[in-house]
Amino acid sequence: MKLYSIDFPLNESNNIFPNSSENININNNNINNSNPNNFINSNTDSELYGNYKPSSSNNFINNHHNNQSSDIHSISQSTPNLSTLISSSSNNNNNNNNNNSPNYSMNSSSDQAPNLLNMDSKLRWNQPFQNQQQQQPTSEVSTNSANTSSENTTCNNSPVSSSTNYIPNNSTSNVVLNSSIPTTSPNVLSAPNKKRQRDDIDCGNNNNINNNNINNNINNNNNNNNNNNNNNNNNNNNNNNGYIDPFYLRDDKDFNNNNNVQLDNTNISQFNDSKELNIKIKKDNNNNNINNINNINNNNNINNNINNNKNLQPQQIQQPQQPQQIQQIQQIQQIQQIQQTQPQQQQQQTQQQPQQQPQQLMSGNLKLPSIHHLEFEVEKNAKKDDSTNTNNNNNNNNNNNNNNNNNNNNIQQANVNTSPISTSTTPNNNNNNQIQNQPQQIPQQQAQQQAQQQAQQKKRKTKPSKYSITPSISLTPTTVTSSSSTNSSGSIGASPLSTSTNIPYSVTNNLSSNNLHSYMNPMGQDYSTSGMLSTTNPYTHHSPNTSSTVSSSVTSPLINQYGTNPTLTNNHSFYGSLASNQNTGASDGNNNNNNNNNNNNGGSGYFQSPVILSPFQKSSNPLNNNHNSNNVYNSSNSHNDINDYISLNSSSNNSYYNSNSGSGMTTPQSLGHSPSHNDYNSNNNNNNNNNNNSNNNNSNNSNSNNLTNKYDSNSSLSLLSSIGDNNNNNNNNNNNNNKSHSSSYYSSMSNNSNPSSSSSSSSSSSSSSSTLSSLNNNNKLSSNNGHIKYEPTSSSNYHDQMSQSHIYQNNFTYYDQSFPHPPVKKTHRRRPANIDKSTLYCHNCGTKNTPEWRRGPSGPATLCNACGLAYAKKQREEETNLHKLLLHSNSYSYHRGNMLESYVTPSLLPLFNTAANVPYLNTPNNASSSSSSSSSSSSSSSSSSSTSSYSSSSYNIPNTNTQYNTTSATSSFKPLTFSSLKTPENTRNTLNTNNNKINYSLNGSI
């Protein structure tokens, strides 16, 4: 029997193993929902591949066509040709002694797998297999070969940058703990799972753990094939529940070797003491790396023991202790389960899924958790730590009976033993311990969750279920006893918000168990093992369970644009982890930056969550992403100010997001997870070169003066308008170093629509502040701003005319002299006392002699006696006739008859001021004034708009627009606008015909 070490290519649709009768289901954690009751195939397709079901449960690994590292197909008889070694060691991992590079030894009895030697062409790795195709029966490879080829070859493609890419964490091992993975039946899985690669084999940091986990998974699969025969092995596989990164390098002290996962002395002591399950990280863990696990013959545990490394033997002596420990822990667990009522368990299940989802939402879901998560029940969680730790161990022991849970248990022990490899700067390697601390669900709860998740998956396979953030009892956070809060890069299930000691809200160990994971991670990549998880970053809001690579949903661009403002402890370690893990040298093929990662801020974790929650505080410091110092912040300052925005697009040279595979999927660029809009992705897809990364950094560096944070400068607008700018402009502009982070929104849109024009349009060096100033300073009537300009239809002094007194001057004062009205005061027919009768004459007949002078219409003593009597009689008759007429009319008119006596002022009469110079009557004066004013205003507006429109690019079509000078710095992509642009001739003509009309002409070339 030959032992073969296997390299897992990150190739799409490379089935390393053809179809073998029996699956070595490499992940019993199959980070999705595998049925804990499915003992035959504990590594169900749902576990490994999220919610996508492979073609067959036996060949679920065959379904990893696209993005998982190696499609290890069901290997009933492990293939002899698989000599490639899975070894990716971080640069810092020199502590691993002999078996640092895990030889994925396969007990091969058949040659069903293709030679891996021929698979280099399909590998996405920048480098072919280096020293790793050593066919060694001993499954041991020197540490140097592993270190040289590990991260460059295996992990060049970060899973985040594209569906096939993997995140090479150079920092500590990121262990994906699906500690209690409620696994669903493999039938639930959807066909897209075929394109998924095996669960996140996160390069670099997770190599030891993943290799250990793969070996454990293979062992578990063998056990699954031999459930009846492998009960002891299942009991031994306490640590198989977690998914360990197969690329994680392992020592010769691998306790997981042989299916029989043996605990270290530290692990045994800790594992025996349920209260001390907060496994303290010991600095000796670097030496306690996982040894390569030889493949187990399907029927013989003895063969497995024979095939295992010599290091396994001392550990095998410890095996009989585990069943007892398991029984004790199971008893404790049963007691706890009895205490927990069934409805509480259901609530826990419902809550665990929501909490699993927020971490899984990390890279691409619009449904973003509220900021409330940042400080969510920290005190309650701190109180729950001890109980949850005991629950975790109890769950691990109970899960030992379940082949599905064996991998998770292996992961925890692997986490205990394995130390973070690459984080030399992080004083305490909390990576593995946080993973251990992740609570594991009770098997009953797993079964319930499994049923729920299966029902949900049947209903909707791609849509995430709504999630609440309330922590479930079973998932109560466990305290990480590590003293430093430099969060371990391996803290996979660890709540991003958790301090080093507390996971603020229960970490969802079922990373891919929920539908959300399949929704957000259709490729099934589990990134929690990858460096994506903020390894030193307790603050990352989500564990990156869901790959942003294939997320169908769009992350909220605004929230992604901002750096988080971690309110908890260790801001330095938080940002240090962001900056240091920003560089994944394998993606760019640059190993030099791998050392810079840990050296910048002392942090080792990626800043994972696209959900970067912050109070949106603008940083006064421009973000200078230096090409050499991969620090996210100003490399010279390396300030870890919380208020600093993390430059979303400042693609540090090795940021795992930079290398794009052109998959058309939202690949968050660099640390800030650029908005996953398809508009922005088009440009990123075009830029698959590593040169773009360096050029982006160079452009950022050259713009250090201009590079006011793209959220800074005066552009409140640039926050919205520059959403896709840095990604598109920096990626597309290899030659444009003058591109400022905040280019206008439309230029970025044009860049997205046409990548060819993006480089040209982005060459404008105007910053967002200049853009806003130009926008504000443009002529108010010009069409540059894209606004429709309206002008008054009448003269500008219209309000003056309204306010003039001519409207009001006659009111109640003007009397028409032609209208008959009585004098202001009546005489009461009183004869004047002193009349000179010699001067009197009758106005009617002219006589001067009369016995009595009577009153007439002209006043007293104007008529002679006869004329006066006749006149009075006539007046009476007329009045009588008038009253008669009024009596026959309506009563209102009769009583209103007084108004005929003209006591009412004439101005109130109906048509009194008909001839007055009121504005609504176009008298010649008004017409002339209004026309002149309107003509002047329209002409001025036309001139200004015409000049401005010609000076600036009018409606740049992205395909044809190569105009570099946007002098007005308005948006190069200007919408259609109707403005009052008119030539003087048109103005004259329109004013002559219609004085009050203004013709709005269409401005802009189409």
Swiss-Prot record:
Listed GO CC annotations: nucleus
Molecular function per GO: transcription cis-regulatory region binding; zinc ion binding
InterPro entries in UniProt: GATA_ZnFinger_Domain, Znf_GATA, Znf_NHR/GATA
Record carries keyword Repeat: no
Zinc finger boundaries on the chain: GATA-type: 842-867
Biased composition (Polar residues): 71-86, 159-168, 181-190, 411-426, 528-539, 558-589, 662-680
A UniProt-annotated Pfam family: GATA
Biased composition (Low complexity): 55-70, 87-110, 128-158, 169-180, 205-241, 388-410, 427-456, 468-496, 540-557, 590-601, 619-638, 681-706, 713-785, 928-954
Record keywords, A-Z: Metal-binding, Zinc, Zinc-finger
Origin: domain of life: Eukaryota
One biological process term in Gene Ontology: positive regulation of gene expression
Region (Disordered) residue spans: 55-116, 128-248, 381-499, 528-638, 657-800, 925-957
UniProt-recorded name of the protein: GATA zinc finger domain-containing protein 7
